[in-house]
């Protein structure tokens, strides 16, 4: 790997080095996004907590994605809050990314994603007027919570890759 980088440096060519997960399922695009080659989805590398430094409720996650699209995060304008089904594709019980920020529980997501952050991620799916669903990444189970709750919750935006 080092010789490849040195050859590229001394040859005058500049090329981005693509970083892949160990199992080659996930590709780090080098622009704060990760592409899942199994599902065709592109994800934020960081969850919203790592990106902004604060926990969010469901309503704030909607506004956060709206701002991402206005700003063209990673030169894309079609980011969305994922469904429960999309979120569960990231959960892999045999993989440990890191510990939940401030807790002793493991986050079961590929280590190509940014470390720490939140384990409870919002989905776009509502449960009545006051609640919404999400996925807990230390168990892989769906949760149901008040849309106003910020307690240790974040989200990870998604889009369909080109």
Predicted stretch roles:
Residues 2, 8-80, 84-162:
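Glycine-aromatic-enriched surface loops/turns that form tight recognition elements
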């Amino acid at each position: 790997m080092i010789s490849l980088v040195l050859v590229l440096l001394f040859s005058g060519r500049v090329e981005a080095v693509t970083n892949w997960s160990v199992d080659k399922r996930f590709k780090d695009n080098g622009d704060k996004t990760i592409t899942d080659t199994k599902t065709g989805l592109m994800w934020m590398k960081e969850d919203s907590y790592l990106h902004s430094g604060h926990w969010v409720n469901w309503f704030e996650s909607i506004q956060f994605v709206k701002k991402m699209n206005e700003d063209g995060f990673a030169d894309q304008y079609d980011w969305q809050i994922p469904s429960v089904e999309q979120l569960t594709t990231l959960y892999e019980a045999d993989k440990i990314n890191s510990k939940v920020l401030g807790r002793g529980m493991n986050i079961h997501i590929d280590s190509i994603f940014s470390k720490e952050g939140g384990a409870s991620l919002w989905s776009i799916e509502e449960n009545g007027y006051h609640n919404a669903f999400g996925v807990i990444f230390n168990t892989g189970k769906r949760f149901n919570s008040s849309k106003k709750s910020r307690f240790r919750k974040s989200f990870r935006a998604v889009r369909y890759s080109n």
